[in-house]
Amino acid sequence: MNKELFNKASKADFSKILINKGYAYFNKGKYNLNIIGIRNAGNNVTNKFDDVIVVEYIDMYGIKSRNIFAATTEPGITSMTKPVSYKGCAILVPGQYRSAWKLGYHKGKYEAIVQYKPVKVYRDNNKDAIYDFNPKTIEEGTFGINIHKAGTHSTQVNNWSAGCQVLANKEDFDTLMKLAHR
């Protein structure tokens, strides 16, 4: 877990941040989830769970709640050096993608939050294991950018992400899925 990023996420006023960006913030209805991925801006080196996924919602008692999960919002070294697509590895472009995901199955194996509508990705195809966020490579479409789990307690991204948003451990993922089912 990136403790500095975790601490910043713990103190952030996401409703204000999202509204200031012109995004929607869901503050009505119970368990109307705001799922927010925060990318570590410290470096562009691959293979660490150094990002966080924040989930904010109103719980069953009407109380605003927040969970913060260790995650990666970027591909692992395996996909960066050997991209699945000839166009290069997909890296989700920051932005709000409302209703772009739904409950489904990740690679047909287990329930996850799966891409349902188009999103934008950068394409990184130089196979150097350093993220390139080049606006000239942006592509929009459905690429299977899912929100899923890594191993039980993974410390390296490796093969867990080819562009997906991946929670580092199973317990956090189970919590996210319980929230998504409410």
Q: Where are the language model's segments positioned?
A:
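Soluble non-cytosolic domains of exported or imported proteins
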Residues: 167-170
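Residues immediately within or flanking Cys/His clusters that coordinate Zn2+
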Residues: 161
